[in-house]
Amino acid sequence: STNVRVRVRDRFLNIRESSNIKFKNIDFSAGSINLRGSKYFTLEDCKFSFSSDMGLLGNSVAYSHFLKVRNCIFEYNNDGHSWSQQLSPHPVLENVLFRYNDWFGGTAWSPTTDRNYRGDSMVKAEAQGDQSWYGTQWRYITIENSYTAGIFAGPRSLIEYARLENLYEGCDCSGIQRNAAGARYSTTRFSWIINSPGLNGVRFDSKCGARFGDLHNVVSIGNRRGLRLK
């Protein structure tokens, strides 16, 4: 056959402790990237296809402050996160499309920016007056036609102008997931969650001491639950 794709490895790019780098207009196919301790990193006009598969590692980021992902596409990623960013203050994802991801149920594999603070825990960060985890932004995001959950944005994050449509996952997850930590000091606005029959449109957890999160101008249609407020 003349139409054969051979995959020889899972991760073809590791970058550590290297800052002020910009990748623009690059197609990453059949492999994933890993960033550690790389500050002020920008991905712009890039496409990530077939980044992960069964038993292979997906795209991941940790300890990389002020990372920006703009005008990018993540597609055909199976059994892994198309994008997972942890312990990295001030990430920005803007005008990003996630489509045709995952084949299996019960795994979620939502695009994620979580634990966006420095230090061992959010409680310790607050006690030390650490403001570094204020700045997560998800703006102009589309997630569609996938067997995944939606956005897991983390604490003190902003989600706005997001459209999530035709998500077929059925686990205990949501189009926009604001669990106890992720709801705290968050803002979710001007977003649409459409036709996710196995998911909550939005999950928003509260607590006796309150979460201080804002949720407004959100449309939820054709989902298992429109808004799950706990």
Residue positions per predicted region:
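Long, charge-dense partner-interaction scaffolds in eukaryotic RNA-expression machinery
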Residues: 108, 175-180
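A flexible loop/linker signature enriched in serine peptidases of the S9 family
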Residues: 170-172
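Right-handed parallel beta-helix
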Residues: 19-27, 39-52, 63-78, 88-115, ...
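Active-site-proximal loop/turn and secondary-structure-junction residues that shape catalytic pockets
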Residues: 208
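Extracellular beta-strand-rich solenoid/capping regions of secreted or surface-exposed proteins
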Residues: 5-22, 30-40, 53-61, 80, ...
